[in-house]
Swiss-Prot record:
It catalyses: N(6)-acetyl-L-lysyl-[protein] + NAD(+) + H2O = 2''-O-acetyl-ADP-D-ribose + nicotinamide + L-lysyl-[protein]. This is NAD-dependent protein deacetylase. InterPro entries: DHS-like_NAD/FAD-binding_dom (IPR029035), NAD-dep_sirtuin_deacylases (IPR050134), Sirtuin (IPR003000), Sirtuin_cat_small_dom_sf (IPR026591), Sirtuin_class_U (IPR028628), Ssirtuin_cat_dom (IPR026590). The lineage of its organism: Bacteria, Bacillati, Actinomycetota, Actinomycetes, Propionibacteriales. It comes from Cutibacterium acnes (strain DSM 16379 / KPA171202). GO terms for molecular function: histone deacetylase activity, NAD-dependent; NAD+ binding; zinc ion binding. Signal peptide: none annotated. Belongs to the sirtuin family. Class U subfamily. Binds 1 zinc ion per subunit. Zn(2+) binds at residues 129, 132, 150, 152.
Amino acid sequence: MTGEQLAHWIEESTSTVFFGGAGMSTESGIPDFRSAGGLYTTQHDLPFPAEYMLSHSCLVEHPAEFFDFYRTYLVHPQARPNAGHRALAALERAGQVSTIITQNIDGLHQEAGSRQVIELHGSVHRNRCLACGRAHPLSVIMDAPGVPRCSCGGMVRPEVVLYEESLRSQDLDNATTAISTADLLIVGGTSLNVYPAAALLRFFRGRHLVFINREATGYDRAADLVIHDGLGKTLSAVQRAVMP
C-alpha cells in the first residue's frame, strides 16, 4: 500500500523533487562510506585515515597518495545506472519528477537520462587545472601515472567537494529553491547525517515528505510516509503504477 500511496502523490503533485544519497548508487555496486560494509570500515591498509585521504589537506600535502586513493575508491567506471536511476529518469521524461538533488559524484543519474540534476558534491566527470582553469575529462585523471597534470604544468583536480571544502553556493541555492517550491519531496538512500546537505530539508514546506531507506533514520517520524526497502525495487514499482 505504501508504494501505491507514493504513486498517487506523484500523480497529483505539481512539483516532485527527489533528494538522494549513497544508497542510490550502492545498487550499482558503488560502496558507501559509513555503513558496516562501507569504505570507512573496510579499508585498513591506507597510508592515512580515510577521511583525511578525502580532504583538501591531503590533496595539497600528499597529492600522489590522494590521487591513488581517489582513482581506486572514488571512481567506478564499471558502474551502470540501476533500476532506481532508470525509474527516476522515466518519471522525469513523463513530467512527474521535476528535479533530482544528489549527494553522489558518479553521474549515474545523467547516464540514465535525467536532465534536471543538482550535484551537491560535484562530479568525477568534471575536472579542472588549478593553474589555468582548463576543463579536462575523467580520462586525464585516470590515465595519469601519478598526479595528473595539464599541458600548462598545473595539477588537474576533480570538481568534487572534499572535506574542509564548502559546497558551491550556486548548487546550494538551486537545491534550496527546488526543495522550497516542491509539494512532494522524496528522500532516498541517505541517513541524513552529512551536513550541510541534510539541513536542506528544513526548507521543505510542501504537502508530503517521503523517506525511502533500507534502515531507519532519526528523521523518519517527520515523514508522511516511510518505506524501508530498496530504492530500485520501490521506484520501479512506483514508476509502473504511475506509467502503466
